[in-house]
């Protein structure tokens, strides 16, 4: 029960934050609907494809769906902006100095900008997730 309330609170927070972002941008329509199974995915790097639903990844903010193939390994890296992830299918695997997390369907994780971490896709299922940032999206390999 506590988990359901937590997920509901996260969903409301993300929805309200997104509404504020859209209020600050000129939009021809206030409603955007996208189905993760029917959007057009484009390959980004081997093992990763993405479909931007709103915004611009190069300038930010943006939101969209991302797929990791089974066993995908992004290596240790950081991002300039915070990255918010909600997993839809499979599992987004996450690891940092504090330990590892398996982020599964219905789970949420916020990765602060500048935080060094590793991420990847489940070995059998890969991962399908919705992600958004309030700045540009980047991946800076760790040294």
Predicted regions mapped to residue ranges:
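A short, N-terminal "cap"/entry segment at the start of jelly-roll beta-barrel domains
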Residues: 22-62, 143
């Amino acid at each position: 029960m506590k988990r359901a309330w937590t997920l509901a609170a996260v969903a409301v927070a993300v929805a309200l934050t997104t509404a504020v972002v859209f209020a600050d941008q000129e939009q021809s329509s206030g409603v955007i609907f996208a189905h993760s199974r029917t959007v057009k995915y484009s390959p980004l790097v081997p093992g990763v494809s993405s479909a931007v639903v709103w915004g611009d990844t190069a300038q930010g903010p943006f939101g969209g769906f991302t797929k990791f193939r089974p066993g995908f390994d992004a290596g240790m890296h950081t991002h300039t902006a915070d990255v918010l992830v909600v997993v839809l299918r499979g599992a987004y695997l996450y690891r940092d100095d504090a330990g590892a997390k398996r982020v599964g369907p219905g789970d949420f994780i916020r990765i602060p900008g500048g935080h060094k971490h590793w991420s990847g896709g489940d070995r059998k299922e890969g991962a399908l997730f919705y992600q958004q940032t309030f700045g540009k999206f980047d991946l800076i390999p760790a040294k």
